[in-house]
């Protein structure tokens, strides 16, 4: 059985955290153009994650979006109009330490938090009667939490979308100059994207 917890511990190494995450704080109000609503999901006492919701209409498909490592949810004010033109509701979530969120990012926190963020996303839509199909999408680093959600909650999703994602931990750590951390691990797991995605049977792009 794959030890995903071991893989997450690897991504909490201080050198990896420093090279993998680039948190940037950004505070922004609700806006009308584009229509964007702030929403905060509580993870634990003192820690909440700031999200931005860009609505089209209640019966439209809904995308839970995990962004790349150098972005924040408010950055998507510039991209959201494209999704709106396509008839989509877009829900963008940050990570700890990013945007309007509390705390500091780590690899294990990003994956564990994804579960609470998914439940927060579904609760948000249910409370507002947004009944369209639900998808999860990840870009770059965000492919890891997106694949995690699709792996665990496929029955609640209509599909998975991966943009500029990555598969193996070996290739990712090699790109950021950290491959030496794998010298004593013959079967490194990392986030396990390559393992999890083989088990995902919902439509995937």
Task: Outline where the language-model segments fall.
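An N-terminal hydrophobic leader/cap segment in hydrolases
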Residues: 1-42, 52
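Short beta-strand element of the alpha/beta-hydrolase
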Residues: 60-68
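The serine-hydrolase catalytic nucleophile loop
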Residues: 69-82
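Conserved alpha/beta-hydrolase
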Residues: 83-102
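Alpha/beta-hydrolase active-site loop
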Residues: 105-127
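Alpha/beta-hydrolase fold nucleophile elbow
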Residues: 127-140
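Active-site nucleophile loop of the alpha/beta-hydrolase fold
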Residues: 161-171
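The feature captures the conserved acid-bearing segment of alpha/beta-hydrolase catalytic domains
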Residues: 182-205
């Amino acid at each position: 059985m794959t030890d995903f917890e071991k893989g997450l511990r690897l991504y909490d190494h201080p050198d990896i955290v420093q090279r993998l995450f680039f948190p940037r704080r950004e505070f922004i109000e609700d806006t009308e153009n584009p229509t964007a609503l702030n929403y905060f999901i509580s993870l634990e006492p003192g820690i909440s994650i700031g999200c931005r919701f860009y609505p089209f209409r209640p019966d439209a498909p809904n995308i839970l979006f995990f962004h790349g490592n150098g972005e924040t949810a408010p950055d998507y004010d510039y991209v959201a109009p494209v999704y709106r033109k396509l008839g989509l509701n877009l829900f963008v979530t940050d990570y700890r330490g990013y945007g309007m969120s509390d705390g500091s990012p780590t690899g294990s926190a990003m994956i564990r938090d994804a579960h609470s963020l998914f439940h927060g996303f579904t609760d948000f839509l249910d409370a507002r009667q947004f009944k369209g199909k639900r998808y999860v999408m990840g870009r770059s680093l965000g492919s890891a939490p997106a694949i995690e959600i699709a792996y665990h909650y496929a029955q609640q999703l209509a599909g998975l979308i991966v943009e500029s994602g990555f598969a193996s931990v070996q290739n990712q750590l090699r790109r950021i100059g950290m491959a030496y951390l794998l010298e004593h691990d013959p079967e490194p797991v990392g986030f396990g994207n390559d393992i999890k995605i083989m088990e995902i049977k919902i439509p995937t792009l």
